[in-house]
Amino acid sequence: MNKKDQLQRLIDKYKSDIDYYRSARYNETQLRTDFLDQLFLILGWDITNAAGKPTNEREVLVEEGLKARAGENTKKPDYTFRLFSERKFFLEAKKPSVDISTTIEPALQVRRYGFTAKLKISVLSNFEYTAIYDCSNQVKETDSVANSRIKLYHFTELVDKFDEINNLIGRESVYTGHFDNEWSEIENKILRFSVDDLFLKQINDWRLLLANEFLQIKNELPEEKLNDLVQNYINSIVFLRVCEDRDLEEYETLYHFAQDKDFQSLVKKLKSSDKKYNSGLFSLEYIDELLSNANSCIWSIIEQLYFPQSTYSFSVFSSDILGNIYEIFLSEKVRIDELGNVKIQPKEEHIDRDVVTTPTHIVKEIIRNTVVEYCKGKSDIEILNSKFADIACGSGAFIIEAFQFIQDILIDYYIQNDKSKLQQISEHTYKLKFEVKREILCKCIYGIDKDYNATKACTFGLLLKLLEGETTETIGKDTPILPALDTNILFGNSLIDSGDKVKQEDIFSINPFDLTNYQFDVIVGNPPYMATEHMNQLTPKELDIYKRKYKSAYKQFDKYFLFIERSIQILKEYGYLGYILPSRFIKVDAGKKLRKFLSENKYLSKLISFGSHQVFKNKTTYTCLLFLNKENHDNFSFYEVKDFKKWLTREDKYLLSSTYQTSSLDSDTWVLEKKINDILKLMFSKSEQLGNIVGKSNVANGIQTSANKYYIHKEIKSENGFIYFEYDGIEYHIEKELTRPYFETNRSGDDSFYTYKDVEPNSFVVYPYKKVGERIQFIEYDELKRQYPKLFEFLQVVKVHLNDKKRSIKPDPTGPNEWYRYGRSQALENCDVDQKLIVGILSNGYKYSIDNHRTFVSSGGTAGYSIINIPNNVRYSIYYIQAILTSKYLEWFASIYGDIFRGRFVARGTKVQTRMPIPTIDFDDPKQKEIHDTISSKQQYLNKLYSQTQKSADRDKIIFERQFEQEKIQMDYLIKNLFDLGDLDSEIPTVEDLYKNL
């Protein structure tokens, strides 16, 4: 029987006894069993888990039919439909005697469920009518029943509209990703404004109100204490309010206190809650002083937690949503300005930095590849004796999810082995008994964070998670109900131990923590991303310790490098690690030591790359999932996500996978994408590396004076062997012999540096060096004073700056009068040549320009300029090499091996340049030599055409530009034939398209 026939039979059944079904005798539980279960089975949903999926991946969660005590305000949705473990929509059932097409309360209820859970839609049905509601809008008491209602189907329409309904809420729609596409407009509304934004705004309003009141009670409160007090009170009130909606406390208890401003009853309630729940949640200071005030803000805060002032349904306010809110909450703090005004401002480490929360589906994927994998084949005893941690836990998103997954794993274990540990919720659904959940939390879950308020938020989230699904009956009579988690959620610096020679005066700011005393079976998380320069600004004393302590603290390392290394140190043998990270460590030079550490120890088991897909909301970060095992792996898996939305549905065809031998990795850049590897192999098979052609020493960085302000100047005039310039408002002149032409980038960023335009010096650099034979020598103090008196005089003027202890000169000076040496002496001989290529290191293409003026340039890490010299004995023309470097092939190569920076720039340092593949020419073969000479001549002509374009009037300029473009097309064709990549050529974007998509 096909699905439409099954549905028609169900409709006929309803019609045949419609008066009975509409009567008060027929209840909601009967409706669910007789009709709604059947309707959604027809729509493809596995209502009873007949497929035997593990608990954490059940398609449908079904609530108990009629809870004895649950009122409309404290019950959960009757059905939760999921994509694996992600909630997609709720179904709320009403008996047919409730006309959901006209009655407002059920509509408001299902919308509040969906809004609180950040769902796109939810469904309301009594079978006679089935309604689909948009859940992106705030719910107001004055809303009509039709407000936000997208669809309303009468039962007689179900067969005719079956295909449409199946497309909207059918199982196949959800599991193919069509559901998300169908409701994408609603998703966009949620991204712009959702429960997170609303609740965070409310919490911040409460913070200001409470802070002002506490300062009235005790005006000398320090900021840290004030923040702790405010957070403790908000946690306490929100906790009790959540417990009311979860049927753990009498509904509206707090509301009645607020209405009556009954401070004695509220104080009594808070103190009794301290005894009942313990765990430090209700250890509140200044209770009597705050609550005895009839005008206290606490009363309005409480009222705002109830409908209609509150849109939320706390029975479905999930821990991950609350965690996201707290993650942003933790990035700011209450501050008192110099005028005594209370404000909320970013913490120092978050100033000018976006706060991002890890998407729940990413958290779940990491848990699935670590916690679930670790627990496979283990008994309950083995699992309960294991330790799972996040050592930069923040508000606890990862360990809260780990806690849930461990519960689900043990439910499946006990269904097979010991049902006495379980409580049956409905015919096919079980939960762990409360004492087992409590045991998991106390024995298995650990979190560490350097932010004290983060540990409090994490504890709060875990305790709410512990109480999820509980009622007064299931938690029992024993008190205190909640465990103290002060030995599980720990306040300290995960990266620094007490033995790391921390000075006594820095103990409180650094907060060393002996994490090596702990050993974990699984570590998960999203560790802090912080560049070396930011660490130097915010935590310079910690930075010094990192450099001494960690192998991965190399060059311009990122803080997350250290977290990977630290996690491996404290991971047990055969333990699992799962992190979401920027993928820069795979390729940047600073990641060299980390790559060596991982490859030599063969820890890598799996790497999932998201490519250019942006995982974090409103944040441009190229990310990957890194999975390590503390055991030797001969092979590892690499996955490329081609379609992120399809990846979420686990459709393998949208995930390219490769298996590599671990021995193929070393400290060098990891290039793992199969198609990229295929292209690179083909390119290198026809080419030779630039460094091998010209010699690696001829690919060099520019000069580094370490004091450009005093060495580099704009020329006013040049006469009689002297060059005139202005410094600090005074005109000077020095011997021109000890200067060199210099090119510097204009501050406006318009540096006029372009492949097709020869370098034109725009300033000069003081050059206290001379050439003796083939060597460059520093001009000693006495010789300088004697032969170059004007430069000597000027250097005396700036001596105080050049001789500054903070200025680094390498190699170290051996005498007292070397203070005017450059900071580094590399590249001097490379700059001072008749003709060379100058390369813009950080660029978005077309930054390989020819210099004919012996121009000097500066370099600095991933910015500035570098130099390529073509020795006389090399047969390749400088113009041939310029043409190849400018091509789309080498720009693409730079994007693979170079660093990608914000603003769509790629840094191609000398390490990348030396490896660039230059198509090989057999100069003894006349045809090949002709190709070389044609490309060389055409590049010269392109440079000339561009120069004419710049100098011409508008009429001629149009013609020159047209010629230039035609010649450029011909050049592209010539170089395409040189590389001869066949069908793979289309995989390499043009230079312009490459940077559009970065």
Swiss-Prot record:
The keyword DNA-binding applies. It catalyses: Endonucleolytic cleavage of DNA to give specific double-stranded fragments with terminal 5'-phosphates; a 2'-deoxyadenosine in DNA + S-adenosyl-L-methionine = an N(6)-methyl-2'-deoxyadenosine in DNA + S-adenosyl-L-homocysteine + H(+). It comes from the Bacteria. Pfam families: Eco57I. GO terms for biological process: DNA restriction-modification system; methylation. One of its GO terms (molecular function) is type II site-specific deoxyribonuclease activity. Mg(2+) is absolutely required for DNA restriction. PANTHER family: DNA METHYLTRANSFERASE A (PTHR33841:SF1), DNA METHYLTRANSFERASE YEEA-RELATED (PTHR33841). Monomer. This is Type II restriction enzyme and methyltransferase RM.Eco57I. It comes from Escherichia coli. The lineage of its organism: Bacteria, Pseudomonadati, Pseudomonadota, Gammaproteobacteria, Enterobacterales.
